[in-house]
Amino acid sequence: MKILVIQQKMIGDVLTSSILFEALRAKYPNAQLDYLVNSHTVPVIENNPNIDNLVLFTNEEESSKLALLKFAKKIKKQQYDVVIDVYSKLSSNLITLFSAAKTKISYYKSYSSFIYTHNIKRATKTDENCGLAIVNRLQLLKPLDITIASAKPKIYLTSEELETSKQFLTTNGINLKMPLIMISVLGSGENKTYPFAYMAKVIDQIVATTEAQILFNYIPKQEKEAKAIFNLCKAETQAHIYMHLFGKSLRDFLNLTAHCHALIGNEGGAVNMAKALNIKTFTIFSTWIDKDTWNIFEEETINESVHLKDYKPELYSGKTEKEMKPQAMKLYKKFTPELFQQKLDAFLIKI
């Protein structure tokens, strides 16, 4: 049997959807399990023992209809028995359609339902602490008679990687016996990034409470923005921030985060990666993102999160995520650090 799981686009999505492979491997130990992902997301699923092959979706297929068509025809030649389309967008619709698999599973959408043999309606509520992002993905396994209530993404780092990153930190002045906290200072876009002045206040609070060593999660092209947040911090806070120590690649970031006591900051892929490494997290949600979907494995003092809706629910009454998105920046101004100062302190003293 050959099974293809499709999850394009974001790193956090690719990591989250990787939970399907452990369940598929348990059900079909001898099957060929392949994962179709964007090439830049590979580091979060590297060394996963349940994935046989990675099928890489590149910028060429992303930007060219002709390249996408050729790619879909290549998938058809693989003769998959089952295709699970988690992404469920136009490109993956086309790939699934061309696959000619006997079993084709995805989320229900009126315009694409004819492509799939099984169309699964997303749950809108759950009592599971794993969150809706996990619950809805696991529902895609039901047509294969696989029923699981919860599953947690895992990242597989080698002992060599961990030792190399440990030496990198210690030779650059980090004391691993003292608290080390990674700050997700920037979101994936402006409307997913906590205002710089507010983030600086959060970092000030973290250092004042814990005297922790601070690392920033950013890539070289984001140095200007990261430095701007650094400059807004108090002088005594700046003395605790190791600006020059950052992951120059996604895999480097994972290895550095594995040595941290917590990751705190903007919701996004970095938070999901930290959770997959069993690192404590405190997440600040964008004002327009649905917290119920992405606050996976919420647990007091372990994985906590805050959203403006927690403190000012009247601003969201009867409004959809789509309606809130254009107001994101205006809403951020109302989402002051003082609103969750007490909750953050309670989290910090448990590190």
Q: Where in the sequence are the language-model features?
A:
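Catalytic machinery of carbohydrate-active enzymes
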Residues: 1-351
